[in-house]
């Protein structure tokens, strides 16, 4: 599965990408640190799923999720956040996120969610 990872914390994004790349079936093919950069990477294509952290430093993370979903509805978008507000989670699901996960999850739980989304692609 080819992944676009959008996260503004460089160390977290790089570490998580490295860990995902160690999995035989996953490759982080593109990384972005902002909505603007995420849009650029999205336009390049070649992704099977996207992981988007919220909030992002520039405004419009929900629009990025909407753009990702509208550009290719078959590409699942996984949103990760430290925000525990159900209204915000609902906003991102309505924008097209397949799932909204708390950043307090373990790596194994995140990995399971990514693979679950990948399995949906194969259906």
Residue ranges and their predicted role:
Residues 1-11, 16, 20, 50:
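Conserved acidic segment of CheY-like receiver
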Residues 51-68:
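Conserved phosphotransfer microenvironments
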Residues 87, 105-115:
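C-terminal output helix
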Residues 43-45, 68-74, 95:
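Conserved phosphotransfer cores of two-component systems
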Residues 115-123:
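The C-terminal output helix
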Residues 31-49:
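Acidic, metal-coordinating helix/loop segments flanking the phosphotransfer/catalytic sites
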